[in-house]
Amino acid sequence: MNPREFISNLPDEILGKILSLLPTKLGVSTSVLSKRWRNLILLVDNFDLEDSSTSGFSAFLEQTVARLNTCPIKRLSLNGRHYRFSSADSWISTAFERGCLELHLQSQYLDTGILSSNTLVKLTLSDQIYLQGLVPHDGTVFFPALKTLSLGAVVADRDVYESLISGCPVLDELSIRDGCDDPPTWKKSVVNKSVKRLTVSFHHPMSAWAYEDNVWFKTQSLVFLDYSAFVSQGYTIVDRMDSLVEARLDLRLWVSTDSYDSDYEDKDFDVYRPYDVFGDVTSLVSGIRKVKTLHLSPDSLEAFFFCCNHMPVFNNLRNLSLESDEEKGWQALPLLLNNSLNLHTLSIKGLVHRVTSRCGDACACISERKTGMCCLSACRIKVLEITGYGGSFIELKQMRHFLGKLQCLETVRIGVERDGNNEHLRANLSSLHRASSECNIQFI
């Protein structure tokens, strides 16, 4: 049986599924093959419409919609910045009328009047979509069944933007990405009672004015938070995030902290003391204090130290994951360890960090005679995970410090870099003194 006969012998339902996987323009073109293929297009429920040219795209879509006026639509992906404003609204409305479950839109303009569907469960609005229309009333429900909402750099009035987020009463996952060269579009607030997973990326290094107001969160059902942005003036947590299980923070400072490393107790330091670091993350850090797993970027470690007036107690924290950078310090690490009494696992990607006078005794940057009681000695950490270990003198010194101070360690997992003499590195690490007799070193 040749391939052509094999395809022809497939059931209509299977051929319809195959056509749904093709770009819609290609799938529609098969209707010229025969009467059977002309009818098969009616089984397509997944439409991917894209064209970068101005000529023919609108006509093609209008003809397609007209031919498929009885077809159910499960998924619609619409990408075309050159078609008419009214045509796009018409196509989207048609998809909603036919029970569309998933909509991905990349266009120029969208009328807020059509943002209503009882069936839609996933919505993606890409960069530079302009939402236009009347401001919705308070309490307006746009999508009663929507579970996932993804917003690029969507341009809209504050009331429209915020109402779109709050108008999804069963929302599970919200993603906001705003970091292009154009002016900021995110309104720095998320208000939704049901959202469980929230991802925010807000990076505009040339628009410092956009960070001068507080960031608002009213997300009492939140379970997972991934927040990446330059630090703002402040943060307002309207309802406590008591349900939060995991948080990933990448909080970037606006200035280098090189000039802030001197000892504040130095009698001559006040003469040269630098200005306060912009931003206050105290409320944000306090808002996530019930978290069980916390991931911090190198910048976040510095933000926790310079922009947090009071470090809360993390009673529920079991897993702490850090990433190091040779230009960023570990100033906040002693505070975190002292306030995480039930910490079980400490994971660090890279041990090399900037040496400062503020790292405290969590690292080996300063001589032991200046530290007194080491914060590591009181830690109950049972698992230490180190990745990206290169075997340098500084790294070996830090490992000696960890193994010699952490008295409850049971397992140490070390990921050694591929370059270098691995056998020599392993031998050096295995020979280090261990404060815990139960400590077992594993190489991964």
From Swiss-Prot:
Coiled coil spans: none
Q: Name one Pfam family in it.
A: F-box
CDD domains cross-referenced by the UniProt entry: F-box_AtFBL13-like
Q: Quote the SMART domains the UniProt record gives.
A: FBD (SM00579), FBOX (SM00256)
The scientific name of the source species is Arabidopsis thaliana (Mouse-ear cress)
Q: Where is the F-box domain?
A: 4-50
Alphabetized Gene3D superfamilies for the sequence: 1.20.1280.50
Source taxon at top rank: Eukaryota
Matches recorded under InterPro entries = F-box-like_dom_sf (IPR036047), F-box_AtFBL13-like (IPR053781), F-box_dom (IPR001810), FBD (IPR006566), FBL60-like (IPR055294), LRR_FXL15/At3g58940/PEG3-like (IPR055411)
Tell me the protein's name. Answer: Putative F-box protein At1g64540
